[in-house]
Amino acid sequence: MAEARSQPSAGPQLNALPDHSPLLQPGLAALRRRAREAGVPLAPLPLTDSFLLRFLRARDFDLDLAWRLLKNYYKWRAECPEISADLHPRSIIGLLKAGYHGVLRSRDPTGSKVLIYRIAHWDPKVFTAYDVFRVSLITSELIVQEVETQRNGIKAIFDLEGWQFSHAFQITPSVAKKIAAVLTDSFPLKVRGIHLINEPVIFHAVFSMIKPFLTEKIKERIHMHGNNYKQSLLQHFPDILPLEYGGEEFSMEDICQEWTNFIMKSEDYLSSISESIQ
């Protein structure tokens, strides 16, 4: 029997449908069939509809692209157990308590989830680049469960104030390649924008190491705002930023604590997917 393949033009219409829509079943069945025929492991992530929809939505229901993304996701997790095999919150609690990472309370005008990372709160003498990477992976595994995030993707703000040589030394070519893989075609989230602020001159050497591994689409979505960033950042994220970045209603401390609490409450789920993929 010929395998159904969604036409790219149908992607936006299918993306807007709820998980239980019968119109999604052909794509789900076809992707599940490919995964089973290829012997994709059923643990720790069974091939449920909700799991497979992440990959279909991330590639606008193009079956071939969704299948490639699914394969790359398993390949990346299998090849990076130092990051992906331990997603227990306790593995990153120190970074969370330091205020390194928070998630904005509201989405941006396009519906994207907005994440903030503050390099000054990463002590490279205490936490490795893999620890920092694991923070992003844990957040990604949690927010990818949200249908609206599957549809509208994410945007990330990196505050690079405090970036030092000790941070740069942690980003080896191997780490750079793993970062690029997740940003491009190894995780079922649409990366809609990467915003860098307070970037020092010494950061550009690290960025030049990561850049060759990025797709042109991702490169086009990277915005460097410099030190005088507030006006340009507010244009992208009006009315949703914390006080430190030009907002009016809440602080970074507030959202860091809120997100830390959410991660800790999600410990059972994170533990359930914290297995090495063979």
Swiss-Prot record:
Any GO BP annotation: vitamin E metabolic process
Per the UniProt entry, the effect of residue 246 to R is: In AVED; mild and slowly progressive form of the disease
Query: Per the record's keyword annotation, is Cytoplasm included, yes or no?
Result: yes
Coiled-coil stretches: none
Biased composition range(s): Polar residues: 1-12
Noted disease association is: Ataxia with vitamin E deficiency: An autosomal recessive disease characterized by undetectable or markedly reduced plasma levels of vitamin E, spinocerebellar degeneration, ataxia, areflexia and proprioception loss.
Q: Keyword annotations for this protein?
A: Cytoplasm, Disease variant, Lipid-binding, Transport
| Residues that bind (+)-alpha-tocopherol | 187
The record's Pfam families line, in alphabetical order, gives: CRAL_TRIO, CRAL_TRIO_N
State the compartments where it is located: Cytoplasm
Could you name the domain of life of the organism this protein comes from?
Eukaryota
GO MF terms here are:
lipid transfer activity; phosphatidylinositol bisphosphate binding; phosphatidylinositol-3,4-bisphosphate binding; phosphatidylinositol-4,5-bisphosphate binding; vitamin E binding
Q: What is this protein called?
A: Alpha-tocopherol transfer protein
Query: Matching PANTHER family, A to Z?
Result: ALPHA-TOCOPHEROL TRANSFER PROTEIN (PTHR10174:SF225), ALPHA-TOCOPHEROL TRANSFER PROTEIN-RELATED (PTHR10174)
Q: Where along this sequence does the record place binding of a 1,2-diacyl-sn-glycero-3-phospho-(1D-myo-inositol-4,5-bisphosphate)?
A: 208-211
Location of region: Disordered:
1-20
- Subunit architecture: Monomer and homotetramer. Phosphatidylinositol 4,5-bisphosphate binding induces the formation of homotetramers. Phosphatidylinositol 3,4-bisphosphate is less efficient in inducing tetramerization.
Q: Does the keyword Transport apply?
A: yes
Q: Name a GO CC annotation attached to this entry.
A: late endosome
Looking up PROSITE patterns in the UniProt record yields: CRAL_TRIO
